[in-house]
């Protein structure tokens, strides 16, 4: 059985796929916005870009978030 570490979205490389395992901090209103866009526990994501900003795909939508927000989104990579 393979053991994989949970990493923040900010730690992942472009092309990495995984599932959201949790969102760790109060994002002062951003958590509701992320949820409305489909970024919820269990959602599948694919990292598209990590510089200069974090861009990822979730539910067929490309999203860009600040690095601080990306650190708060924990992912179980595939």
Model-derived features: where do they sit?
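Compact, glycine-rich, soluble single-domain proteins
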Residues: 1-78
């Amino acid at each position: 059985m393979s053991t994989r570490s949970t990493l923040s979205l900010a730690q992942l490389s472009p092309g990495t796929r995984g599932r959201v395992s949790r969102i760790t901090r109060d994002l002062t209103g951003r958590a509701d916005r992320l949820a409305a866009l489909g970024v919820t526990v269990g959602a599948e994501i694919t990292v598209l870009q990590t510089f200069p900003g974090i861009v990822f795909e979730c539910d067929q939508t490309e999203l860009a978030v600040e690095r601080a927000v990306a650190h708060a989104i924990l992912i179980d990579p595939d």
